[in-house]
Amino acid sequence: MKKLFCFFFILLGIVVALSTEAFSQVDLDVETGVVFSGYNDVRIPGDGGTLFSLSDELEADPGAFYRVRVLYNFNDRHHVGALFAPLSVDSTGRLDRDLVFAGETFPAGTPLEAAYKFNSYRLFYRYDFLRKTKIEIGAGFTAKIRDARIAVEAGGLESEKINVGFVPLIHFRLLWRFYNRFAFLLDGDALAAPQGRAEDVLAALLFEASDKIDLKAGYRIVEGGADNDEVYTFALINYVSFGAIFHF
């Protein structure tokens, strides 16, 4: 885990080091709110575990979240940034059948405590191919490092599956200034492949509070997963999001 943090912050340092006078603006984007589970289906191992739901068969309580993004804008159309987006959801309950999970068997009816963690570290680049007074549209690519963990604990038994890996994504953004200081923002990363899929998309209303601060409120969806011999996991996570973008 320490190596993962070191790697991410080294890359972030490279981005910061690139911020010379050629950069016209630095943005700090902070976001918080409430996160709650849609579906969250798991089978570990993918070819022999018990398929169960962390949200339908167990109870997943809503929780708070936060995300931090730093963005450098230069040459009008080019943007480079870094994102830290931690996510953690805890579930409790019982199953009416034995649970085979990551090499351990939990008897039916046992009170279960499950933890779902999916932290995300990203570096991205975007080029705005359309920039008008009312509308901006851009696209690029994202390099994502996922730090995932699913764990189950009950009656002195505990088992977990940890997965840390690299995921390439397509980055996109649409900003529509539809009325005075109000704008609609659609911003996200997404990609689908035979190995799995991932989507992280925000639809939000922006209000230009001043030249230095934009306020935002909206709905974010994080969805995706993978299906292979080691793991089957597909989740839909919903966010009620509030935040601010500070322009320096």
Predicted regions and their residues:
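Short glycine/proline- and aromatic-enriched beta-strand/turn motifs that initiate or cap beta-hairpins
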Residues: 22-87, 247
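Hydrophobic, lipid-facing positions within transmembrane beta-strands of outer-membrane proteins
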Residues: 28, 54, 64-68, 119-123, ...
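Residues on the lipid-exposed face of transmembrane beta-strands in outer-membrane beta-barrel proteins
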Residues: 30-32, 68-72, 82, 123-127, ...
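Extracellular/periplasm-exposed beta-strand and loop segments of Gram-negative cell-envelope proteins
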Residues: 38-63, 86-118, 146-165, 173-175, ...
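Repeated loop/turn-to-beta-strand initiation elements of outer-membrane beta-barrel proteins
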Residues: 77-80, 133-135, 180-184, 212-215
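Solvent-exposed loop/turn segments connecting transmembrane beta-strands
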Residues: 133, 166, 189-200, 229
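Transmembrane beta-strand segments that form the barrel wall of outer-membrane beta-barrel proteins
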Residues: 181-196, 221-222
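Predominantly the C-terminal beta-signal and adjacent terminal strand-loop region
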Residues: 197-247
